[in-house]
Amino acid sequence: NHMGVLGSDNAWWLNVLEHGPASPYADYFDIDWYPLSPQLRGKVLLPVLGDHYGQVLEEGDLKLCFAPEQGEIYIQYLENSFPVDPREYPRILDLRADILRTGLGTEHPDTQELATLSDALRRLPERYSAEAESRAARVRDGTVYRRLLAELCARSPEVTAFLQENIMLFNGHPGDAESFDSLHQLIEAQAYRLAFWRVAADDINYRRFFDINDLAGLRMEDPAVFGDTHRLIFRLLSEGRVNALRIDHPDGLYDPQMYFRRIQAWRDWR
């Protein structure tokens, strides 16, 4: 019925935060992508902040980070990591590009490859594409481009240092509100909206387990969701390593009767 989210270890949820409605897992979670609030259209509200967003931002508690080994850019808040939409990577890759060209040379292969990667990332399909092929291409190609960025950083310490310096420029300086403008604009461009935890009761747009923000509801009535979430369980049953199941909180399911019937027919779902 629900799954732990809001940490940094749920690959499905992180994929949704990265790609929004284009994620192959967007329909796995019970998310209202078109709530009444126009600020949340196509976004997931994340009520994880300990204070109002503006206050947290200007205190420097939201940090833009870069992991060169994975070619990933993300936003860090306490123990939570939030992926950055790969289509927005050029904001960082293109910053001060003239400095890299001056240092390495315009014709240097690393300079040219970074520019090529930035252009490719910029051309990724948007999160809101209605075409299944475009959504799949976005996720697939975004992963490929991140890997290529990681490979470039692995062989070019100059590019790695350049990108890390750009990241530092985004992070601003507490006491200087304008220094956080670029980071704010980047956060606003994501498929999620970071918010004070107290707003969850009124604004949250994903189903939770009771009122626990980090337990997001799953659409277990969807056969694909049921199959993927129960694959390990059914394998353990077939291997004889499990001989009984305890079903907790079935009343929270969309269709409890259907769920029990599928469980009883578990051999058909292996």
Residue ranges and their predicted role:
Residues 1-201, 239, 249-270:
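Acidic/aromatic-lined carbohydrate-recognition and catalytic surfaces
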Residues 201-218:
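N-terminal small/glycine-rich loop or linker at the start of catalytic domains
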Residues 205-210, 234-240:
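Short amphipathic alpha-helical segments, especially helix-boundary/capping motifs
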Residues 213-223, 249-250:
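The substrate-binding groove and active-site-proximal loops of carbohydrate-active enzymes
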Residues 223-238:
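Short, acidic/polar
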Residues 242-246:
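Structural preference for beta-strand elements that scaffold enzyme active sites
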